[in-house]
Amino acid sequence: MTGDRGAHFGKFRGTVANNEDPLRRGRIRALVPTVFGPETTGWALPCSPAGFFAIPAVGAGVWIEFEQGDADLPIWTGCWWDSAAEMQPGLLPDPQRVLLQTSGGHSILLHDTPGTGGITLHNHDGQTIALTGAGIELGNGKGAAVALQGPTVSLNGGALEVT
């Protein structure tokens, strides 16, 4: 494959074509038109921090590199967004927020703003757990809520309070 393509150094824009790695190692196959035309890459290994495992969805924009420039040895090194509309709304425009969100809508938000920051877990059905400097809040997404602030436990927005 590389004999007729030459060496390819640097990052190339690609699009995920297949993310179902039969070896379950986090590999993807991508379309990289500037290198392969309409063909997909071979299985591209992930380049990610130790302990981190996330696979981009089919159709997602990914950066592709090649080990020692060899097109037979693709590596996917991260994702790119075509526009701000593709970004998760929980992130914009605050750089002090880190959001991990699945395509199914489950998320973990880490917010480092002093005084208002914290950790919030959401699932796709609307249940929430929020841990902040002010306290802990639990919600079932259907109206029931528990808030723990200082020595007070509040149920359903103050319908019952225990101190």
Residue ranges of model-derived segments:
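Long terminal segments
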Residues: 145, 149-163
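Hydrophobic packing positions characteristic
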Residues: 1-147
